Amino acid sequence: MSRSISKGPFVDLHLINKVIVVRKNNDKRPIKTWSRRSTILPDFIGLTISVHNGRQHIPIFITENMVGHKLGEFSHTRTFKGHAGDKKAAGSKR
C-alpha cells in the first residue's frame, strides 16, 4: 500500500540537513548515509549520495528519473551469483 498524499514523502531530517549544507557550500563530495528508507526529492538531483548496503557505501548519482523512489532501491543488499546448474550439462556443450 502506498503512502498517503497528505503526509508527503518521508526523508530523514539529518539527510535533508546534509543536502542543504552541500548545496550552500557547492561541495561535490558524496553524502554518506545509512538512510535507505528516505525518498529521493527534487532537491537531490545532481548530487552523489553514498547509500549503505550493509557492507559498504554505494555511490549513487541522483537523476530526474529517480525522484519519488527510495534510496535503498539503488543499493542492492544481496549478491546474485547465478542459479545452481547441472555440472554435467554445463560441461558437455558443443
UniProtKB/Swiss-Prot annotation:
GO terms for molecular function: rRNA binding; structural constituent of ribosome. InterPro entries: Ribosomal_uS19, Ribosomal_uS19_bac-type, Ribosomal_uS19_CS, Ribosomal_uS19_SF. Keywords: Ribonucleoprotein, Ribosomal protein, RNA-binding, rRNA-binding. GO terms for cellular component: cytoplasm; small ribosomal subunit. One of its GO terms (biological process) is translation. Protein S19 forms a complex with S13 that binds strongly to the 16S ribosomal RNA. PANTHER family: RIBOSOMAL PROTEIN S19P FAMILY MEMBER, SMALL RIBOSOMAL SUBUNIT PROTEIN US19M. Belongs to the universal ribosomal protein uS19 family. NCBIfam families: rpsS_bact. This is Small ribosomal subunit protein uS19. It comes from Nitrosomonas eutropha (strain DSM 101675 / C91 / Nm57). The lineage of its organism: Bacteria, Pseudomonadati, Pseudomonadota, Betaproteobacteria, Nitrosomonadales.
